[in-house]
């Protein structure tokens, strides 16, 4: 069948019906039931994974009368399967139905109204955006009630806009600018701007996948929501959520094929990914896992700002960045779970997951009011009837974290085996039921404890620097000599509070390898060590800000730190030799700088 353009409001006739409503075209089919989710996993399993979003559309325009500047172009599949109703409020509702095969249409121009997809459960429906602006003050601008998969694709070189101008929507209503009751794929090589004045930006009841396109979403509540999963595979995505989360999932059960639901996955399997999130609440709120990974030889860059970090953006609509209940519209300075000076009880974390957070690559920058990374263990998962693990794992990538609370908080275990973790500001830097650093580079700046655990802290590899206003490294474990275990890492600690210690345990710590240089004011400094004096050297002294304090063994400098503050009556400890000497110099040019002001031989 030759493709042709089907123009809405063209010469197919207007039929008057009761109440001043007009029908154009063909009637809708009966509603179909929602499709069943079949996808959510870290591994790509899309049936169209190799599809080229720069594909040549088969539609060719023929002579037609395009009234009011809006057109529908048939491309492939079921032809002539839409109806258009002019409502008494002046808006059109265009419904695609009666689909008997996978179907593709393109739309262009300006529509004051909404589009409804009712394709049944057997066939994919693809709506191509070819330079379109859709605005509705009464309905969801784009709504897919049924399809096997709903594809929303921005054509290459086009700019497309969807505006939901509705006010508050009833709890029983659909409050999103783009909504799908089935799996939805938002893609293309053009651009798409979505604005919602009342609630969510883009919402899929099942799985939501985004790739390739330039996407901007501005909304009141959640910018991207997939009840079962959200998977970003490539593209340049910017999200603004004035009262909600940037990305959110809800489900924790498994699909009929046994795939775990509730994951948020950000990778680069389809090209470079640049994701920027500005959210009043959580940047990412995953009901199960949150994962960031570099795949396919491409890069991932994620920037998240929450609450105080996101104050510069206002909605391009009647909505504003208003204050949360009990707070003014000006976002104030931060507070946190550990810090009792918090001014709000809402969750304003950077990345939050109710099971685990896994980062295996990418460049991640988070400026959060609450914890930057937070994994819970107090939410029961439907799939297992067990509580989440609460684990956070970093094996590669570069993380830069700023928080008014914990930079990294795991109800379970924190594990860093590679990559670079830089905590620029925090109340407590890293906190977990256990903390393990076996590789990589970890730098922590905190106003209270640098690394804190209710259980064990094991530093077995990599490089660790802690600059803390409280305890440098603090374990509350009650196991003898198991609170802190130094077994291979190079560790430098500077603690500035006289009432705290650079190394603090309840029942002692163990040294079996690596090198440790620790400096703090005199006070709580004599922690029990299960290794004798052959591995420990210490002395008292004063230390001047800007000077390089070093530990030397047999005439070779081992570790050094450029003092960030002056300590008039202090204590310096070196683990690694019982005969180390200490000194101070203006510079240590012969050593390698692994962090700013931290040096190793």
Language model regions located:
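A composition-driven surface/loop motif
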Residues: 2-601
